[in-house]
Regions:
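Glycine/proline-enriched, intrinsically flexible loops and inter-domain linkers
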Residues: 1-148
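A short, hydrophobic C-terminal helix/tail in secreted or cell-surface proteins
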Residues: 149-153
Length: 153
């Protein structure tokens, strides 16, 4: 596999390679392992059966994290997702959908509620952070939105 020095590797890249990863795509400027079984050995169908019937390893370090924190965090999150955020207990995660004003799906992240006034979206490669900043500003929510590959920096 050809590896570029201009694309980052996740902290788990070496584990993916040890597990037999033979192909990857670039996702959020990070290598994302995409294939463990070569086509001549059954390829995608073998991997599909493993997902369906066994346990598989997924390196999701390529996903972005967006923190929503502040006194209006719950109201803000409840406004932007299709699920009732008030029913998510602290330290529980849920699969959620974010839609635009016409009902089109913008993203389908995992949402983790840390505390009463703090949530974390774990999302794929979209500009949802910009969308959330716009909603926060236009509707005058009192929230801080923070996104970074290393949120504690």
């Amino acid at each position: 596999m050809l590896i570029s020095t201009r694309v980052r590797k996740s902290p788990y890249w070496h584990l993916s390679m040890e597990a037999g990863c033979w192909r990857a795509t670039v996702y959020n400027r990070i290598y994302h392992p995409r294939g463990y079984v070569k086509p001549e050995d059954g390829g995608a169908m073998v991997e599909y059966e493993a997902i369906k019937n066994h346990v598989t390893m997924w390196n999701v370090a390529v996903e972005r994290q967006i923190q929503v924190k502040g006194p209006d965090a719950e109201a803000f999150v409840d406004y932007v997702i299709t699920r009732d955020a008030t029913k998510i207990s602290p330290m529980r995660a849920r699969y959620v959908i974010l839609c635009n004003q016409y009902g089109g799906v913008l993203n389908d992240p995992i949402l983790l509620r840390i505390s009463q006034d703090e949530f974390w979206f774990s999302l794929s490669d979209s500009d949802i952070g910009l969308y959330l900043q716009g909603v926060n500003h236009d509707n005058r929510f009192n929230c801080l939105l923070y996104t970074s590959p290393s949120p504690r920096d």
